[in-house]
A protein has these predicted regions:
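Short, solvent-exposed amphipathic alpha-helices that sit
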Residues: 55-69, 91, 131
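Sec/Tat-exported extracytoplasmic proteins
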Residues: 44-47, 63-64, 68-71, 100-103, ...
């Protein structure tokens, strides 16, 4: 089943990125990483016309809870800060800025939608904040030079 495979692939990729980021962090952790925690941010539509996709955010939160129950990643708990953007690009921008500037997340994880991802990619690139597993059907996000 393709959905199950892609979820496993996504989970492995997330863990690999987080392990790589935390393994090299030592005492100079950088944004979102401490000796005990890794903060990652997400905006996803829990309300509005595409609220059915909120299930993705709830499933991902449950996955990170399972990882944390097993000791986390390199002894650090993963803290997913997931905010409702109602599939509204202005709300996505507002929440993404909060996640980066106030919550100091390591990365933005699995943001959903072409219009919402289009609204935040330049900001994230300028702030040098990784955007991991942006969910979009747009081919434009397949160009790593323009969308690193």
């Amino acid at each position: 089943m393709q959905i199950g495979w892609s979820k496993r692939f996504s989970a492995i990729g997330v863990l690999a990125l987080i392990v790589a980021a935390t393994a090299s962090a030592e005492k100079n952790h950088g944004p979102g990483v401490t000796d005990t925690e890794i903060k990652i941010g997400q905006t996803i539509p829990y309300s509005g016309p595409n609220s059915m996709y909120g299930t993705i955010g709830r499933a991902q939160a449950a996955y990170f809870e399972m990882i944390n129950a097993k000791g986390g990643v390199n002894g650090r708990k993963i803290r997913l800060i997931s905010l409702d953007d109602a599939f509204s690009p202005p709300k996505t921008v507002e929440h993404t800025r909060r996640l980066v500037e106030a919550d100091n997340v390591l990365l933005i994880f699995s943001s959903l939608g072409t219009p919402t991802n289009s609204a935040i990619y330049k900001y994230l690139n300028a702030k040098r904040v990784p955007q991991l597993f942006a969910i979009s059907g747009a081919a434009k996000f397949d160009d790593p030079k323009q969308y690193p």
